[in-house]
Amino acid sequence: MADSDNDSGGHKDGGNASTREQDRFLPIANVSRIMKKALPANAKISKDAKETVQECVSEFISFITGEASDKCQREKRKTINGDDLLWAMTTLGFEDYVEPLKVYLQKYREVEGEKTTTAGRQGDKEGGGGGGGAGSGSGGAPMYGGGMVTTMGHQFSHHFS
């Protein structure tokens, strides 16, 4: 695995990046995959473009999460939840994204609830208690196949699994 994009976070420093710096960035393969979904099939993305977006999205995540973390600390809570992130986005001026993300978060919570409920029923049928893992009754696939969020003219999709 020494040659994977993930070892240096795919960043310009290559093998010279500290472990702490590597942890700051999303894996370049994930960033590239997301970028490709927004482009025509024959489009090419330069390494520099991937690295730039990688750094930007990682910084954005840190920015939003930091604000949400500050809120949780003030409220003496240890766990950041989706609502905290939406609050942080509003506070930091990204309110145009909040309503579509609320829809997305609601769908996600519904799917997670279905997975938990179905896993519990599956465990009861087998005589076990609760059950975990993939037990949604359909090979681990959730009952809701995916979500589509449209924000400022851009559509974002996610398949919950």
Swiss-Prot record:
Spans annotated as Disordered: 1-23, 114-146
Residue ranges of DNA binding: 26-32
Compartments (UniProt record): Nucleus; Cytoplasm, Cytosol
SUPFAM superfamilies: Histone-fold
Protein name: Nuclear transcription factor Y subunit B-3
Record-listed N-acetylalanine modification sites: A2
Expression by tissue: Ubiquitous. Expressed in seedlings, petioles, hypocotyls, reproductive organ tissues and leaves.
Keywords assigned by UniProt, alphabetized: Acetylation, Activator, Cytoplasm, DNA-binding, Nucleus, Transcription, Transcription regulation
CDD domains with a match to the protein in the record: HFD_NFYB
Compositionally biased region (Gly residues): 128-146
A cellular component annotation (GO) from this entry: cytosol
Annotated family: Belongs to the NFYB/HAP3 subunit family.
Molecular functions per Gene Ontology: DNA-binding transcription activator activity, RNA polymerase II-specific; DNA-binding transcription factor activity; protein heterodimerization activity; sequence-specific DNA binding
Biased composition (Basic and acidic residues): 8-23
Function recorded in the entry: Component of the NF-Y/HAP transcription factor complex. The NF-Y complex stimulates the transcription of various genes by recognizing and binding to a CCAAT motif in promoters. Promotes the expression of heat stress-inducible genes by contributing to the formation of a heat stress-specific transcriptional complex with NF-Y subunits (e.g. DPB3-1, NF-YA2 and NF-YB3) and DREB2A at the promoter of target genes, thus promoting heat tolerance.
Organism: Arabidopsis thaliana (Mouse-ear cress)
Stretches for region Subunit association domain (SAD): 53-64
GO biological processes: positive regulation of DNA-templated transcription; response to heat; response to water deprivation
Induction: Enhanced by heat stress but repressed by dehydration stress.
Subunit relationships: Heterotrimeric transcription factor composed of three components, NF-YA, NF-YB and NF-YC. NF-YB and NF-YC must interact and dimerize for NF-YA association and DNA binding. Component of a heat stress-inducible transcriptional complex with NF-YA and NF-YB subunits made, at least, of NFYA2, NFYB3 and DPB3-1 in cooperation with DREB2A. Binds directly with DPB3-1.
PANTHER family: CCAAT-BINDING TRANSCRIPTION FACTOR-RELATED, NUCLEAR TRANSCRIPTION FACTOR Y SUBUNIT BETA
